[in-house]
Amino acid sequence: MKKEDLRIVYMGTPDFAVESLRALVEGGYNVVGVITMPDKPMGRHGSVLQPSAVKQYAVSVGLPVLQPEKLKDEAFLEELRALRADLQIVVAFRMLPEVVWNMPRLGTFNLHASLLPQYRGAAPINWAVINGDTETGVTTFFLTHEIDTGKIIRQKHLPIADTDDVETVHDALMAMGAGLVTETVDLLLDGKTDAIPQEEFYKDVAELRPAPKIFKDTCHIDWNQPVKKIYDFVRGLSPYPAAWTELISADGKRMVLKVYQTEKRPATHNFPVGSIHTDHKSYIDVAVEDGFLRLHSLQLAGKKRMNITDFLNGFKQIAEYTVG
């Protein structure tokens, strides 16, 4: 079968999913429909509806778009069947019921932003950086009942530099993933479906690192950790959702401070953990057990993100605070 004859339905929502859809469209593949989330209410009263990034791109290139509230809704399933997909591709969408993923004759494959079976879950890019990994990647795998556990089709590897954050890794994986999606489609077109069970990639489930969804409390900095761990934690949450701490005044008042960019400075010292040290002009150092974390980019609640010089210009009393 030629790629022009293979009927593909694409499912995705955020920016990460746009690149793979673009690669399919610009590569001449036959995308017959796009499934994405319903438009989200925006504005003060929810009066403005914001379409997903995938919908915006799909509409711009004239692709049919379906936006079901419920994936088991019979009206949606009828519309999906009418597209007569040979293959479905999922990138950053949502968990599919079997009635959806089992519909096409070639099945449904997903692009996941990790080297499965590592980092199954909602936030694989964040956790790879938070854990200080030096490598991650992208995986295509066939969907099955349990989330992120299906047979692996192909993988590509990406080194993580010590200076990378979630944004840089996200963007690199987004581009790499688009290439892997088209490569996977080509393999399936050629009849090469030698997918490998994930169980062959590990001996014990204890070896596997999860990637659970990240909540606000997850992002709270623990200053009792070693400086390297805190440094990785910050870059693993930067720029979104952002690591945060509290500035605590001498009288116990607290202000939330988001931290976006730091520098680790190992050292031996006798300062209390969480104490702040500054020249009031060019740097802020926070003492931790094995050195200092130098803060480079910050944001107080209700304020814009600032570099350290601008922050110090507007916050002269910073040395009177601690963090916690």
Predicted regions, residues:
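Internal alpha/beta domain cores that form substrate/cofactor-binding pockets in large enzymes
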Residues: 9, 32-35, 64-83, 88, ...
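N-terminal beta-loop-helix "entrance" segment that forms/cooperates
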Residues: 40-61
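N-terminal Rossmann-like dinucleotide-binding module
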Residues: 1-45
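Donor/substrate-binding cores of folate-linked one-carbon enzymes
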Residues: 27, 87-213
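Internal anion-binding site segments
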Residues: 203-324
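Amphipathic, non-transmembrane alpha-helical secondary structure
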Residues: 18, 22-26, 77-81, 98, ...
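Structural motif corresponding to alpha-helix initiation and N-cap regions
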Residues: 18, 51, 73-77, 94, ...
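A residue-level signal for conserved active-site and pocket-lining positions in enzyme catalytic cores
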Residues: 12, 34, 58, 88, ...
